[in-house]
């Protein structure tokens, strides 16, 4: 058959599909913070409570249906709706907004190890929070995947 005959059309290479998992993989350095954190659910439009503070990560996210606060577990009232304790890992350095696949690179090994995560992104970097009981296992999974994990020196935000 010649190239022009039916059944012998050239096949197009996929252009929008990610076919090689290692092609865009980048090794990252993660800083592991020692402070135990909590994610607290407040009502929509809630003010940030005076008790909400942290020495590593403090984040407020508000939507029409809720306000979530990430803060030090030690300061959260027992009656508050919360998840934790969690340990935070921050991607070291400032990430360019054009960089793709950072969270994918970091979450893939944790998903394979069945480690649950809560992620937060700031203007500069990404944070991955894991249950305190899974923190060392998460660090080991990252190391096995080519990432580096170092102990962070907390600086109060």
Residue ranges and their predicted role:
Residues 1-109, 113, 137-157:
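Regulatory modules associated with amino-acid/nitrogen control
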Residues 66-71, 125-131:
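A generic structural motif
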Residues 112-128, 134, 155-157:
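A cross-kingdom feature marking solvent-exposed beta-strand/loop segments within repeated
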């Amino acid at each position: 058959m010649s190239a022009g005959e039916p059944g012998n059309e050239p096949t197009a290479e996929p252009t929008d599909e990610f076919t090689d998992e290692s092609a865009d993989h980048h090794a990252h350095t993660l800083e592991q913070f020692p402070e135990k954190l909590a994610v607290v659910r407040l009502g929509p439009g809630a003010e940030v409570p005076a008790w909400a503070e942290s020495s590593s990560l403090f984040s407020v996210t508000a939507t029409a249906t809720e306000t979530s606060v990430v803060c030090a577990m030690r300061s959260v009232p027992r009656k508050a709706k919360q998840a934790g304790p969690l340990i935070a890992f921050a991607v070291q350095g400032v990430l360019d907004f054009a960089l793709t696949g950072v969270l994918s690179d970091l979450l893939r090994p944790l998903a394979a190890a069945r480690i649950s995560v809560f992620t937060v992104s700031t203007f500069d970097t990404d944070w991955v929070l894991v249950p305190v009981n899974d923190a060392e296992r998460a660090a080991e999974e990252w190391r096995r995947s080519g990432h580096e994990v170092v102990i962070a020196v907390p600086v109060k935000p």
